[in-house]
A protein has these predicted regions:
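Extracellular repeat-rich scaffold modules on cell surfaces
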Residues: 1, 65-88
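Repeat-solenoid scaffold signature
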Residues: 1-28, 32, 84-108
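Generic structural signal for coil-to-beta-strand starts
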Residues: 3, 23-25, 70-72, 88, ...
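A residue-level detector for well-ordered beta-strand positions
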Residues: 18, 48-50, 64-65, 81, ...
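A motif-centric feature for acidic-aromatic and gly/ser/thr-rich catalytic loops and repeats
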Residues: 34-51, 144-190
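Extracellular, surface-exposed repeat architectures
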Residues: 53-58
């Protein structure tokens, strides 16, 4: 059924096992220290259980999930979430979000966004600027220094490189493509 049932991730020092219901929803995620052993003792695992009602996730581990009438989450990681105009998040905990008539996010808390003619964010009010190529975001300019992204075969950003070719940030992902780790070197903060 092409479902991920085991991930042995040496980078993170973890092995994860997954089980699913007949709809393909994850029922249980079990975690232990990295191992390549075929059979691992059940007592070595920490487990997170998932509970569903139809298409909605009701709970995972100790976190309960609640949704509005169209399926937007009302809470995330114990913090409240508010929505407007369908799927536009207008607040998360104490952070407010604003949008323009085209549905583009104009602000997130105190950070404002500037768009180009292709509806791409090119600048944030905190001084961060974005560089694009034909495949999307290619890098950033921060405090006058240009950094470019190195991407892996799936298009995930795996490193941020300064103008001298130094790796200043490395990103690592799990088998699902979720960003799972960040390794920082000194960033030029003029």
């Amino acid at each position: 059924l092409n479902r991920l049932i085991r991930e042995d991730n040496k980078t993170f020092g973890k092995t994860w096992l997954y089980s699913y219901d007949n709809k393909g929803n994850i029922l249980c995620k079990r975690e232990t220290a990295f191992t390549l052993k075929e059979n691992v003792e059940e007592s070595e695992f920490e487990s997170v259980q998932y509970e569903y009602d139809g298409d909605n996730l009701l709970a995972y581990g100790t976190e309960a999930c609640e949704y509005d009438a169209i399926g937007n989450p009302k809470t995330y990681r114990g913090k409240s979430v508010s929505w407007s105009n369908g799927r536009q998040m207008v607040s998360y905990n104490t952070t407010a979000f604003t949008y323009d008539g085209l549905g583009r996010r104009l602000s997130k808390g105190t950070i404002n966004y500037t768009y180009d003619g292709n509806n791409r964010i090119i600048k944030q009010s905190n001084g961060l600027e974005f560089i694009y190529d034909n495949s999307g975001v290619a890098g950033i300019v921060y405090n006058g220094t240009t950094y470019v992204y190195r991407k892996d075969g799936q298009g995930n950003i795996c490193a941020l490189i300064d103008s001298n070719g130094n790796v200043v940030v490395q990103y690592k992902y799990d088998a699902w493509g979720n960003h799972a780790a960040l390794y920082l070197n000194k960033v030029n903060d003029k």
